[in-house]
Every structure is written in structure tokens, then in C-alpha cells.
UniProtKB/Swiss-Prot annotation:
The gene is ccmE. Residues 145-158 have a biased composition (Low complexity). The chain crosses the membrane at residues 8-28. The lineage of its organism: Bacteria, Pseudomonadati, Pseudomonadota, Alphaproteobacteria, Hyphomicrobiales. Belongs to the CcmE/CycJ family. This is Cytochrome c-type biogenesis protein CcmE. It comes from Agrobacterium fabrum (strain C58 / ATCC 33970) (Agrobacterium tumefaciens (strain C58)).
Amino acid sequence: MTRKQKRLAIIGGGMSFIVAAVLLVMFAFGQSIAYFYMPADLEKTPVNPGTRIRLGGLVAEGSIKRGEGRTVSFTVTDGEAKVPVSYTGILPDLFREGQGVVTEGMFDAATHGFVADSVLAKHDENYMPKEVADRLKDKGLWQQGAEGAAPAASAASGDKTGATK
């Protein structure tokens, strides 16, 4: 091999290595990214079953149903739409109706419901996950109180008017 051929072989090998590394990084990120949706977003842009997402909103009043073992089903709402959620596991201590929640999982094509593998609840009376709070503010379903921020009463009950008292 001449010097020119050696140089081209080294450059070609280096470029191949860089392309392979970039493709591996893109593949790894593609597997771990979970986009955030509110229930109303899912009505506008349906998600393919098996696609991993984060679903946020409020736990609808009267929707928590305990099943066999540690299985719990409940409904997540943003005041406009509702999504049934099924979760098997131990729920956070602060999980309850009318409170903010972010679930992560996938849609099940057979049941047409959301199957969560993790559930996050707000950790005190003044906290709501930023994504959920921003979306509720955009929809007019957020009330700011003297004691701190809280979801509007109509949002937890699924009232579509968004009116606060």
C-alpha cells in the first residue's frame, strides 16, 4: 500500500467508527425516551400500542378500583378527557383521588387502556409535577390559593367547563 492508500484506509475506518457510535447512541436514546402526554393530547394524536409514554393529569374522583393482589385501576383526567389506567404494584402513599399524578407505561391494544409500570404522585400539598401544572394552567384548570397551588375542583371531577369557585 502506498502512503495515500494507508491514509484513506485510516480515514475510512475512523469515519466508520464514528458513524457506528452515533447510530448506537441514537438507538439507545430512542429506547429510553418517554414523551409526556395529557389525556386530551391522546384524543388529538393517538399513540401506537407498545409506545412508551408518560401520562399526566389528576386522578378522577371515584375512579380508584382495587383488583386482585396489588392491581389497581383508576382514571387520569385533565378536565377535557379521561384515560383508564391499570397498575400492578405498590402505589405511593400520597396517591389519592383529585391529586396530581404522572404514570409511565404503554397502551394495551387488547384492553384499549393504559398499563402503567410506574406511578408518581405529588409529594406535598404545594407541589404538582411541572409538566402537569403547566398544562392545567394552559387549560384554565389551575387555581392559585393563599396556602399554595392546587388543582381546580372541576379538574379532578372531570368537569369540562374548567370553572372555579
